């Protein structure tokens, strides 16, 4: 039993761990910076942790060690994810499982434990202070206030970001609240004691004591809801609550005596006696310390003496009416204890910086924060989506529409047939060279083959996951049918609402199935496009001679004079089309090059440094860069988006001009054709080759899109299959557990007393058979005689005749026989001895003989 009046928080203990090794491995795996750049920082973080976890005594030097390590943990929390890869081991300080550690890969968990030990150190320093002087009391109150402040910081700032299913029992919200109120109560108690020593007025001391009582009461109520705070602490808080309630009334009674309110004095003294008696009830069981018990007993003696004196004086002299307790005015409260969070804990960034700072330089300052790396990836994804989908894809779509319009107008075939009546047009030669150099047919066939392989691979992964879901659903249905819905009471497979349960997985399966359905239809469209132009592409991929053989020469080699003006206007309009296409190609190439060169890392590091300076207490998150992203994308690519709109308007004008010129050209050409100068066959052949070239470009784009789609889909289905495997395994384990629970025998079949009684009844009514000679049964031992003279107990069964104990059959063990070791003489052996055969010669227990009852 301790002799202290107040409680302190014990330290949580940890084991040695190389945090630097986990950080080093993480830097190597996730960052593009070499870990050797941070060798000094890695050594420093290990040294800080080693010093912090070895703080085991109540000495002020430990405060700096814990605060320094905690500050660096807060700082590196903005550089690394919470699960950096270090398994932190900590033993509880309170509760009934202090020998069982909790291991977590969690930086916030480590920070929480370090701050918890800082609060424990403050409380132990307070208990160790000299509370026999006013200065010592002020110091102790300050330590207790800092302890409550650190615990408040843990509760409000660290615990909400812990990201654990449930915090340790001695660090959950209820336990922390109880500890906060406890140390505030002990700080307030120091102020009360100082007021007593300084000779404050009774009324002021009463207000301080009343607040002490309130705080102990709040601490005790929270402790009752905690799983970690012991019964001894709860009894201590309750006793102190009643003690200071009595002390407050005692001081209020003294104030009443001074103000000559003798009736109220007696009422308050009576209430004080009642309170101290309630406090003394907590002494049962030996939970309270000797000092607390002595304080209660001393206060009770003083109260009883004063009450006796006050009642005699009032009865003989003053004759004041004693008011009931309900009419007494509630005592005012004077609160002095406040939870004070040390600035080193509340604002650790202010104590990190250059080497002259209190905690020295911040570690890993040259390491790019993890959130910045994620932000870079997010920006690059948004940039690529903007460039590819909103600009390049839009331009390519407009170009495809333009070629469809030109093809419907039979352009440029009709122009080329007239301008180049013999041989191959220059544009066609360029297209053919491009087809040959790209090995177009093989490229398209290989691309379609790759798409088939990727699709088959993704589909196989998906089918595996779906088969697992179907098998699990079938198993669950079979067991549900076997045991019934009342006993098989877990959710059905498709109705499991857990975060990654059946409901979500089946819904995702439907989504993925939809992806496959739409992609298969798109793949078929692309194949049909390829099959439609395969033969024409084969001609384009051939030699110039084979192309010339495919294209018939015109029957006339000169252009009629009547057709030249219309031909010139159409050629001019078509040249505008080609210039528009050329500008688009150059713009797309330039845009892609600029997108590849758009390195945001230097600028985002500057922005991250600005954010760290502006918000030192806030860990950098990707959301902090949203405005930065928007401004940068607008500055770099807004002009390109506007150019797309201008291109769209320009294309509409050019198309209108081409249609007008082509209409005039076709009218003039029909007159020439009627005169016998037609070249329709050559025109159609040239148009067919030109259309095949542009269709080839379109198919190449489609194939690239398909390949990217299936590569992205593979990541989705693999992740989904992994979730399915985990969920199915969990469901099967759950099913086995539930089935074992259902198949367990009912508790009624385990009634040992009933079985033993039935066995004795059976032995009483049946003559036991002679035991085998190799299994000796013990001699029956006479049971003790029952005690006849007992205290009379009134019972509704008094008239029932008392049952006599039944005799124990030979060879049957009874509870009153006890346990004997050795080889007792059994009936069979006795019979052998009567015939002159030797019996056992040694009654010493032999371990090889086991344990026998008798």
UniProtKB/Swiss-Prot annotation:
State where composition is biased (Pro residues): 767-782
- Residue ranges of every copy of the BRO1 domain listed in the record: 5-402
The chain's coiled-coil residues are 632-699
Q: Which UniProt keywords apply?
A: Coiled coil
Compositional bias (Polar residues) spans? 746-759
- Which stretches does UniProt call biased (Low complexity)? 827-839
Q: What does this protein do?
A: Required for the proteolytic cleavage of the transcription factor pacc-1 in response to alkaline ambient pH. May act as a scaffold protein that recruits the calpain-like protease palB/cpr-8 via snf7/vps-3 to its substrate pacc-1.
Q: Which protein family is named in the record?
A: Belongs to the palA/RIM20 family.
Describe, as the record does, how this protein assembles with itself and its partners.
Interacts with pacc-1 by binding to its two YPX[LI] motifs.
Protein name in UniProt = pH-response regulator protein palA/prr-1
């Amino acid at each position: 039993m301790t002799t202290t009046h107040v409680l302190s928080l014990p330290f949580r203990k940890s084991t040695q761990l190389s945090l630097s090794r986990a950080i080093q491995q993480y830097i190597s795996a996730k960052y593009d910076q070499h870990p050797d750049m941070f060798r000094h920082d890695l050594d420093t973080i290990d040294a800080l942790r080693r010093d912090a976890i070895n703080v085991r005594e109540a000495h002020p030097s430990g405060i700096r060690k814990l605060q320094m390590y905690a500050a660096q943990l807060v700082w590196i929390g903005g550089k690394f994810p919470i699960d950096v890869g270090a398994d932190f081991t900590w033993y509880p300080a309170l509760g009934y499982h202090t020998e069982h550690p909790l291991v977590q890969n969690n930086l916030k968990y480590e920070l929480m434990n370090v701050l918890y030990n800082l609060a424990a150190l403050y409380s132990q320093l307070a208990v160790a202070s000299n509370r026999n002087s006013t200065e010592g009391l002020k110091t102790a109150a300050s330590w207790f206030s800092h302890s409550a402040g650190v615990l408040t910081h843990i509760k409000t700032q660290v615990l909400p970001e812990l990201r654990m299913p449930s915090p340790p029992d001695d660090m959950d919200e209820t336990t922390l609240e109880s500890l906060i109120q406890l140390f505030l109560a002990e700080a307030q108690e120091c102020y009360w004691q100082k007021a007593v020593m300084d000779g404050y007025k009774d009324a002021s001391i009463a207000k301080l004591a009343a607040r002490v009582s309130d705080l102990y009461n709040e601490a005790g109520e929270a402790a009752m809801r905690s799983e970690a705070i012991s019964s001894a602490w709860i009894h201590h808080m309750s006793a102190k609550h009643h003690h200071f309630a009595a002390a407050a009334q005692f001081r209020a009674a003294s104030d009443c005596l001074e103000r000559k309110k003798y009736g109220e004095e007696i009422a308050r003294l009576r209430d004080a006696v009642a309170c101290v008696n309630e406090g003394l009830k907590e002494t049962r069981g030996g939970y309270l310390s000797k000092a607390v018990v002595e304080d209660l007993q001393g206060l009770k003696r003083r109260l009883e003496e004063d009450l006796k004196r006050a009642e005699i004086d009032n009865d003989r002299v003053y004759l004041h009416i004693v008011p009931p307790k309900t009419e007494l005015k509630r005592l005012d409260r004077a609160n002095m204890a406040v939870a004070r969070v040390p600035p080193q804990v509340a604002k650790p960034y202010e104590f990190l910086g250059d080497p002259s700072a209190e905690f020295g330089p911040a570690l890993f300052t040259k390491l790019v924060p993890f959130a910045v790396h994620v932000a870079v990836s997010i920006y690059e994804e948004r940039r690529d989506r903007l460039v590819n989908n909103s600009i390049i894809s839009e331009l390519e779509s407009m170009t495809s529409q333009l070629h469809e319009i030109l093809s419907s107008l039979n352009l440029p075939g009709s122009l080329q047939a007239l301008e180049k009546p013999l041989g191959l047009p220059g544009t066609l030669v360029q297209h053919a060279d491009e087809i040959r150099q790209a090995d177009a047919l093989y490229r398209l066939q290989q691309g379609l083959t790759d798409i088939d392989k990727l699709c088959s691979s993704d589909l196989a992964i998906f089918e595996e996951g779906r088969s697992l879901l179907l098998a699990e659903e079938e198993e669950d249905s079979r067991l549900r049918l076997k045991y019934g819905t009342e006993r098989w009471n877990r959710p059905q497979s498709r109705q499991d609402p857990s975060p990654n349960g059946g409901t979500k997985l089946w819904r995702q399966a439907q989504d993925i199935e939809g992806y496959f359905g739409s992609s298969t239809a798109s793949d078929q469209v692309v194949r049909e496009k390829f099959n439609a132009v395969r033969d024409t592409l084969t001609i384009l991929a051939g030699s110039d001679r084979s192309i010339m053989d495919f294209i018939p020469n015109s029957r006339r080699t000169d252009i009629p004079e009547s057709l030249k003006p219309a031909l010139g206007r159409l050629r001019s309009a078509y040249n505008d089309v080609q210039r528009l296409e050329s500008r688009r190609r150059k713009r797309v190439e330039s845009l892609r090059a600029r997108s590849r060169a758009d390195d945001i890392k230097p600028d985002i590091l500057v922005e991250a440094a600005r954010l760290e300076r502006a918000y030192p207490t806030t860990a950098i998150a990707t959301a902090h860069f949203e405005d930065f992203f928007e401004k940068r994308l607008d500055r770099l690519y807004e002009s390109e988006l506007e150019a797309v709109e201008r291109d769209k308007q320009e294309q509409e004008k050019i198309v209108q001009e081409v249609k007008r010129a082509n209409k005039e050209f076709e009218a003039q050409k029909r007159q020439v054709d009627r005169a016998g100068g037609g070249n329709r066959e050559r025109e159609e052949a040239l148009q067919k080759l030109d259309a095949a070239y542009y269709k080839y470009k379109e198919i190449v784009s489609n194939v690239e899109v398909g390949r990217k789609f299936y590569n992205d889909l593979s990541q989705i289905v693999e992740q989904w299959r992994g979730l399915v495997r985990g969920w199915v395994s969990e469901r099967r384990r759950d099913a086995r557990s539930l089935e074992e629970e259902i198949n367990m025998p009912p508790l009624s079949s385990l009634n040992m007393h009933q079985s033993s009684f039935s066995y004795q009844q059976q032995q009483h009514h049946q003559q036991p058979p002679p035991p085998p000679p190799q299994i000796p049964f013990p001699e029956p031992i006479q049971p003790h005689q029952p005690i006849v003279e007992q205290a009379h107990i009134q019972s509704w069964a008094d008239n029932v005749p008392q049952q006599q104990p039944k005799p124990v059959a030979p060879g049957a063990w009874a509870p009153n026989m006890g346990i004997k070791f050795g080889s007792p003489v059994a009936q069979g052996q006795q019979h052998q001895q009567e015939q002159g055969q030797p019996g056992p010669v040694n009654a010493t227990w032999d371990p090889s003989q086991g344990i026998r009852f008798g």
